[in-house]
């Protein structure tokens, strides 16, 4: 499973103390800005210090869960802390399915108490964690020819802050996929917009920061379409004031695509994505400020006759998580898509 287990003997005289397991995970969320040339397999993170913060240039930093690993290594290296038996458990592939944790076998660990260090706030203890569920949606489409007298545009949504869908979802930041599909729906109605391709979001547990689509409109509507995009950008900026003020929505003329997504599939796709639940669904009734149930519309991408949509659902209440999955399935099944709910794992409190 790729896990690493390390052990440190107890301080002399403390061998009978209960053993402590310090746990973190070694993988990170590998996300970058669209204009950043970066290979997460080969390239080192370009970290820099900004005041009291360590940041990364155009990519995620990996503090989730590099901070936890650093804390564990500091404890293992120290010689000024008296302690009982200590084990360090560094699990693999946490971000994409808890693979390392699921690969643990009984008897591998000797400790009595496990302390998970996948957190970012000093001096606080977590008393629960949400469970998760993946919703994978697939549309099939036929290719249609581009109508005569069409103009093509690359529509891009950029500049959103994004964030971890299990942490920053409560901040109600913009979701690039939803911003894009809101625009597509408006322009489809107003200008007869046709969709050729779409590529929005990235990883399932990251709030989408960027999304783009290649579209066409009748040449006679091109000027009005451009102006409507500028108006739409102003509207979105106003709505996200104080939350995601860096958002930009642009439409730049592009080469005509070879084909378009068929009209029927386009119509069903745009309405289903636009109507998909996203963000905070319910706050905890018993703990102020705690998100109980949420969902992240993480990915929309077209390729080779198929359009894939991916959502990651979270809830500390199992029944709510399952029901939310069925709600999302209902939206997309009504739109003629195939829906698979998988990868469920339980929360705890």
Where are these predicted regions, by residue range?
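Alpha-helix capping and helix-loop boundary segments enriched in small/acidic/polar residues
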Residues: 59-63, 167-171, 202
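A non-catalytic alpha/beta surface segment that caps or lines the substrate-entry region
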Residues: 1-18
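Metal-dependent amide/peptide-bond hydrolase catalytic core
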Residues: 177-349
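Hydrophobic residues embedded in beta-strands of well-ordered beta-sheets
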Residues: 4, 52-54, 305-309
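Beta-strand secondary-structure signal
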Residues: 5, 21-23, 87, 134-138, ...
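Active-site metal-coordination/substrate-binding segment of hydrolases
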Residues: 14-85, 90-96, 101-112, 134, ...
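Beta-rich nucleic-acid/ligand-interaction surfaces
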Residues: 4-7, 90-104, 203-205, 348-349
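Fold-level recognition of mixed alpha/beta catalytic cores in primary-metabolism enzymes, strongest
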Residues: 84-176, 188
């Amino acid at each position: 499973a790729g896990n690493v287990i390390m052990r440190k003997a107890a301080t002399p005289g403390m061998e009978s103390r209960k053993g402590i397991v310090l746990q973190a995970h070694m993988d990170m969320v590998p996300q970058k800005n669209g204009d950043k040339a970066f290979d997460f397999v080969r390239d080192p993170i370009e970290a820099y210090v900004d005041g009291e913060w360590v940041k990364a240039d155009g990519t995620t930093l990996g503090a989730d869960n590099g901070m936890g690993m650093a804390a564990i290594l500091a404890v293992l290296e120290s010689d000024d802390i008296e302690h009982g038996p200590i084990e360090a458990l560094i699990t693999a592939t946490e971000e994409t399915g808890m693979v390392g944790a699921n690969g643990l076998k009984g008897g591998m660990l000797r400790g009595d108490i496990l302390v998970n260090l996948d957190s970012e706030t000093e001096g606080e203890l977590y008393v629960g964690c949400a469970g998760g569920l993946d919703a994978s949606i697939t549309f099939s489409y036929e290719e249609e020819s581009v109508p005569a007298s069409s103009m093509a545009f690359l529509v891009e949504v950029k500049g959103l802050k994004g964030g971890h869908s299990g942490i920053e979802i409560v901040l109600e930041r913009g979701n690039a996929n939803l911003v894009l599909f809101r625009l597509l729906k408006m322009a489809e109605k107003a200008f007869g917009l046709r969709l050729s391709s779409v590529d929005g979001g990235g990883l399932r547990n990251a709030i989408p920061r960027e999304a783009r689509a290649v579209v066409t409109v009748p040449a006679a509507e091109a000027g009005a379409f451009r102006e409507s995009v500028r108006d739409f950008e102003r509207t979105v900026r106003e709505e996200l004031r104080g939350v995601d003020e860096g958002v930009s929505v642009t439409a730049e003329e592009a080469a005509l695509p070879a084909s378009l997504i068929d009209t029927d599939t386009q119509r069903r796709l745009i309405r289903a994505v636009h109507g998909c639940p996203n963000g905070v669904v319910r706050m905890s009734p018993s703990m102020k400020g705690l998100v109980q149930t949420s969902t992240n519309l993480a990915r929309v991408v077209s390729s080779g006759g198929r359009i894939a949509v991916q959502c990651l659902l979270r809830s500390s209440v199992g029944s709510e998580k399952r029901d939310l999955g069925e709600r999302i399935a209902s939206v997309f099944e009504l739109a003629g898509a195939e829906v698979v709910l998988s990868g469920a794992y339980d929360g705890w409190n």
